[in-house]
Amino acid sequence: MLYTFSQSDYPKTELDDYFSYITEKDAVVLWQDGVLLAIKYPDYFAKCKGNCMILKQDILARNLTALLPQSSKIKLISIEELVGITENYLPQLSL
């Protein structure tokens, strides 16, 4: 399953629920304002079982590169890579 997060203001209890369902076979993509989640809640992504990715152009547009946790396992991806990811992971839950 592909989980895409596009907002920065999900309630912590809601994020707890979503991340409890994520398995090794899933992917998580942060884009638009969702890229802020990696900075606000780095512990979620450090413990995430899925393949975590963040859209590079959205990080650059918000000048957040220096704020990303150095130990983060989140991979920066291009828009072209995102297209391939959406083709490979089904179904998709867009949040």
UniProtKB/Swiss-Prot annotation:
Any one GO CC term of this protein is: cytoplasm
A Pfam family: DsrH
Q: Which InterPro entries match?
A: DsrEFH-like, Sulphur_relay_TusB/DsrH
The Gene Ontology biological process terms listed for this entry are: tRNA wobble position uridine thiolation
Domain of life, per lineage:
Bacteria
Protein name as annotated: Uncharacterized protein HI_0577
Species, as recorded: Haemophilus influenzae (strain ATCC 51907 / DSM 11121 / KW20 / Rd)
